[in-house]
A protein has these predicted regions:
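Terminal targeting signals and extreme-terminal segments of soluble enzymes
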Residues: 2-170
Length: 170
Protein backbone atom coordinates (compact mmCIF):
# COMPACT_ATOMS: atom_id res chain seq x y z
CA UNK A 1 0.00 0.00 0.00
CA UNK A 2 1.38 3.37 -1.02
CA UNK A 3 1.32 6.24 1.45
CA UNK A 4 1.24 9.98 0.87
CA UNK A 5 4.97 9.95 1.66
CA UNK A 6 5.64 7.43 -1.13
CA UNK A 7 3.64 9.59 -3.54
CA UNK A 8 5.50 12.75 -2.48
CA UNK A 9 8.86 11.05 -2.95
CA UNK A 10 7.76 9.83 -6.35
CA UNK A 11 6.90 13.39 -7.42
CA UNK A 12 10.21 14.74 -6.11
CA UNK A 13 12.25 11.99 -7.80
CA UNK A 14 10.34 12.30 -11.07
CA UNK A 15 11.01 16.04 -11.22
CA UNK A 16 14.65 15.74 -10.16
CA UNK A 17 15.39 12.70 -12.33
CA UNK A 18 13.10 12.64 -15.37
CA UNK A 19 14.72 9.45 -16.73
CA UNK A 20 14.38 7.60 -13.41
CA UNK A 21 11.05 6.06 -14.38
CA UNK A 22 12.69 4.49 -17.43
CA UNK A 23 15.42 3.10 -15.20
CA UNK A 24 13.05 1.87 -12.52
CA UNK A 25 10.74 -0.01 -14.89
CA UNK A 26 11.89 -3.58 -14.74
CA UNK A 27 9.54 -5.07 -17.31
CA UNK A 28 12.43 -6.47 -19.30
CA UNK A 29 14.59 -8.54 -16.98
CA UNK A 30 17.17 -8.96 -19.74
CA UNK A 31 18.12 -5.29 -19.38
CA UNK A 32 19.29 -5.93 -15.84
CA UNK A 33 21.08 -9.13 -16.74
CA UNK A 34 23.01 -7.52 -19.61
CA UNK A 35 25.91 -5.71 -17.92
CA UNK A 36 26.63 -3.57 -20.98
CA UNK A 37 23.18 -2.00 -20.61
CA UNK A 38 24.46 -0.31 -17.45
CA UNK A 39 26.27 2.14 -19.71
CA UNK A 40 22.92 3.28 -21.16
CA UNK A 41 21.33 4.38 -17.90
CA UNK A 42 21.60 7.95 -16.68
CA UNK A 43 22.18 7.05 -13.07
CA UNK A 44 24.84 6.84 -10.41
CA UNK A 45 27.43 5.11 -12.60
CA UNK A 46 27.17 7.56 -15.49
CA UNK A 47 27.16 10.49 -13.05
CA UNK A 48 30.52 9.22 -11.75
CA UNK A 49 31.89 8.43 -15.25
CA UNK A 50 32.00 4.67 -14.57
CA UNK A 51 31.83 2.51 -17.70
CA UNK A 52 31.65 -1.27 -18.16
CA UNK A 53 34.25 -2.13 -20.82
CA UNK A 54 34.50 -5.94 -20.75
CA UNK A 55 32.31 -8.80 -19.61
CA UNK A 56 33.25 -12.48 -19.50
CA UNK A 57 32.01 -15.62 -17.80
CA UNK A 58 32.14 -14.52 -14.16
CA UNK A 59 34.46 -11.61 -14.92
CA UNK A 60 34.23 -7.91 -15.68
CA UNK A 61 36.35 -4.87 -16.40
CA UNK A 62 35.04 -1.47 -15.34
CA UNK A 63 36.79 1.87 -15.85
CA UNK A 64 36.49 5.41 -14.59
CA UNK A 65 38.16 8.45 -16.11
CA UNK A 66 39.16 10.74 -13.29
CA UNK A 67 37.87 14.29 -13.35
CA UNK A 68 38.20 17.05 -10.77
CA UNK A 69 35.05 15.86 -9.00
CA UNK A 70 36.61 12.39 -8.61
CA UNK A 71 39.38 13.68 -6.38
CA UNK A 72 39.60 14.21 -2.65
CA UNK A 73 41.10 17.44 -1.20
CA UNK A 74 44.59 15.87 -1.43
CA UNK A 75 44.30 15.48 -5.20
CA UNK A 76 43.95 11.70 -5.11
CA UNK A 77 41.07 9.58 -6.37
CA UNK A 78 38.41 9.62 -3.65
CA UNK A 79 38.18 6.40 -1.65
CA UNK A 80 34.43 6.35 -2.14
CA UNK A 81 34.90 6.35 -5.91
CA UNK A 82 37.39 3.49 -5.68
CA UNK A 83 34.95 1.55 -3.49
CA UNK A 84 32.13 2.24 -5.95
CA UNK A 85 34.31 1.02 -8.82
CA UNK A 86 34.87 -2.25 -6.91
CA UNK A 87 31.16 -2.56 -6.16
CA UNK A 88 30.25 -2.12 -9.83
CA UNK A 89 32.96 -4.52 -11.04
CA UNK A 90 31.90 -7.24 -8.62
CA UNK A 91 28.21 -6.69 -9.33
CA UNK A 92 28.73 -6.94 -13.08
CA UNK A 93 30.89 -10.07 -12.74
CA UNK A 94 28.28 -11.70 -10.50
CA UNK A 95 25.47 -10.90 -12.94
CA UNK A 96 27.17 -12.64 -15.86
CA UNK A 97 25.64 -15.87 -14.58
CA UNK A 98 22.21 -14.51 -15.45
CA UNK A 99 21.13 -13.71 -11.91
CA UNK A 100 20.26 -10.37 -10.32
CA UNK A 101 22.46 -9.49 -7.34
CA UNK A 102 22.86 -6.89 -4.64
CA UNK A 103 25.88 -6.39 -2.40
CA UNK A 104 25.36 -7.98 1.00
CA UNK A 105 28.76 -7.34 2.60
CA UNK A 106 32.02 -5.74 1.52
CA UNK A 107 35.65 -5.37 2.54
CA UNK A 108 38.17 -3.14 0.78
CA UNK A 109 41.91 -2.72 1.15
CA UNK A 110 43.43 0.53 -0.09
CA UNK A 111 47.02 -0.37 -0.98
CA UNK A 112 48.39 2.86 -2.45
CA UNK A 113 47.17 6.29 -3.39
CA UNK A 114 45.68 6.87 -6.81
CA UNK A 115 47.38 10.09 -7.81
CA UNK A 116 48.78 11.28 -11.14
CA UNK A 117 46.64 8.85 -13.09
CA UNK A 118 44.00 9.61 -15.71
CA UNK A 119 41.86 6.55 -15.11
CA UNK A 120 41.29 3.59 -12.82
CA UNK A 121 40.45 0.09 -14.01
CA UNK A 122 38.71 -2.50 -11.83
CA UNK A 123 38.68 -6.19 -12.68
CA UNK A 124 35.93 -8.22 -11.05
CA UNK A 125 35.93 -12.02 -10.70
CA UNK A 126 33.47 -14.48 -9.21
CA UNK A 127 35.24 -16.73 -6.71
CA UNK A 128 32.19 -18.78 -5.68
CA UNK A 129 28.55 -18.57 -6.74
CA UNK A 130 26.31 -20.41 -4.30
CA UNK A 131 22.57 -20.95 -4.16
CA UNK A 132 21.72 -17.63 -2.48
CA UNK A 133 25.05 -15.83 -2.03
CA UNK A 134 28.35 -15.51 -3.81
CA UNK A 135 31.88 -14.26 -3.19
CA UNK A 136 33.29 -11.85 -5.77
CA UNK A 137 36.62 -10.02 -5.76
CA UNK A 138 37.87 -6.87 -7.45
CA UNK A 139 41.28 -5.38 -8.06
CA UNK A 140 41.75 -1.73 -9.00
CA UNK A 141 44.71 -0.57 -11.08
CA UNK A 142 45.93 2.86 -12.18
CA UNK A 143 46.87 3.65 -15.78
CA UNK A 144 50.42 2.29 -15.23
CA UNK A 145 48.93 -1.04 -14.03
CA UNK A 146 49.90 -0.49 -10.38
CA UNK A 147 47.57 -2.19 -7.92
CA UNK A 148 45.63 0.48 -6.00
CA UNK A 149 43.04 -1.52 -4.05
CA UNK A 150 41.47 -4.94 -3.62
CA UNK A 151 37.98 -5.78 -2.45
CA UNK A 152 35.95 -8.82 -1.47
CA UNK A 153 32.19 -8.59 -1.83
CA UNK A 154 29.52 -10.99 -0.73
CA UNK A 155 26.57 -10.73 -3.07
CA UNK A 156 23.02 -11.88 -2.54
CA UNK A 157 21.21 -13.45 -5.47
CA UNK A 158 17.84 -11.73 -5.57
CA UNK A 159 14.70 -13.70 -6.36
CA UNK A 160 13.82 -12.94 -9.99
CA UNK A 161 10.26 -12.06 -8.95
CA UNK A 162 11.45 -9.26 -6.67
CA UNK A 163 11.46 -6.73 -9.49
CA UNK A 164 8.23 -7.60 -11.24
CA UNK A 165 5.45 -5.02 -11.32
CA UNK A 166 3.24 -7.01 -8.95
CA UNK A 167 6.02 -7.38 -6.39
CA UNK A 168 6.86 -3.68 -6.57
CA UNK A 169 3.28 -2.74 -5.70
CA UNK A 170 3.20 -4.75 -2.46
Amino acid sequence: MRTWYDNALNVIWTEAYPNMEQTMQMENKAVYLDPFRYNEFEGFNSHNHIVVTEVGDGTSVVEVKLVQESLNPLGMAHGGLIFTLCDVATGVAARTGGRITVTLDSNIHFLRRAKDTEKLVARGRVVKAGRTTGLVTAEVFDDTDKLIATADMTVYYVDENTYTDSAAQK
